[in-house]
Amino acid sequence: MRRALIPTVLLALAAAGSLAAAPAAFVYVGAYTHWEELPNHRNPPGGASHGIYGFRFDRDSGKLTALGLAAETRNPTYVAFAPSGRTLYAANEIYQFRGRPAGAVSAYAVDPATGGLTFLDQVSAGGAGTCYVRPDHAGRNLLVANFGGGSVAVLPVNPDGSLREASAFVQDTGSGPNPRQAGPHAHSFNPAPDDRFAIEAEFGTDRLMVYRLDSATGALSPADPPFVAMAPASAPRHFTFHPNGRIAYALGEIDSSITVLAYNGASGRLRPLQSISTLPPDYKGKNTAAEVLVDRAGRFLYASNRGLNTIAVFAIDGAGRLRPVAQVPSGGRTPRGFCLDPLGRWLLAANQDTNNVAVFALDPATGIPAATGETAEVRSAVCVQFLPGLDHR
């Protein structure tokens, strides 16, 4: 098995000339760095990392070439990019920021030639335990979810990609039936395809909260209705739209489920259509689901299972409903985050408890990922993302 080992400093890129003939992309991995800052923290099997790590990815061979530590920062457990690909945003999952109970968000300029990151700024997320960031499609605002604080925020984006203080902040209330749902826990916050609405996956209250989003001002207001209830103790974690913009998918962490929803773009209303397990019928072990993504053609949906340690594959029919296709071993233990190559050829999975990112080739006919044997070592890897919009040769 090939391994791309991480050096402690950003590697010089002159040696990358040998890859010039191959289509390539940059990949970034977020990881836990300070477990002691988390409530009920545990000692990870491989220890903690130091921040965000960069790789060059060859789209012909599936090979990852380590570029090293791209940014040293605390607990960057989720990263996302501006639509232009020129700015990287990291959720700093911390519980104290500048003397207050809050998490933070860091912004970095991306060098399109080298993949290097230049620090722009770091601002408060308003609530503690920041776990998710996502820019709106216009690139005007960054949507933020705070798991520990049970809140969401909107951070306006400056022309250079840096961030301003929150233009909107909403504190959630309520609880759910599972002991892990003793209070509210916002787990993700995503814009609708036209940026008119934003949808929050509220882990603690089993709800998808829907807000009207004013893209010009960054203001939030409740939609009508303001939420759709999910199954009790499902614990909504992540949420994604189908490319057609009329269907959406919500991932339940605790019950390992996917809920298919019809989306009304005029009102923001979500209507459940189907609920399906991410697990095979005969599996009786422990599991929590982590990530859900749809391929760019809208033909296949993927979800990660922590416990079963697989990527679940579903075919999507013309109505957006799901049919199970395969359970593919993730190449390690505890696959938390994974990403899809924007060109539709590859899947990369971050396995938290085996400290690696595994590379899979996607079958264009079946959608099933096939392990390539390529893997990169990153301690406590939890998020992996392709840099969008830029090919590097």
Question: Residues of each region from the PLM?
Answer:
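Short, conserved, GDST-rich strand-edge loop motifs in beta-rich repeat architectures
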Residues: 25-47, 90-104
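Residue position within the beta-strands of beta-propeller blades
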Residues: 29, 36, 90-91, 144, ...
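Short loop/turn segments immediately following beta-strands, especially the blade-tip
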Residues: 56-62, 108-115, 154-164, 211-220, ...
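Short loop/turn segments immediately following the C-termini of beta-strands
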Residues: 32-34, 93-95, 147, 157, ...
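Short, solvent-exposed loop/turn segments at conserved positions within beta-propeller repeat blades
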Residues: 43-49, 97-103, 147-150, 182, ...
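Beta-rich, blade/repeat-based domains predominating
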Residues: 38, 73-84, 126-141, 175-196, ...
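A short beta-strand motif characteristic of beta-propeller blades
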Residues: 65-71, 118-123, 174-179, 223-229, ...
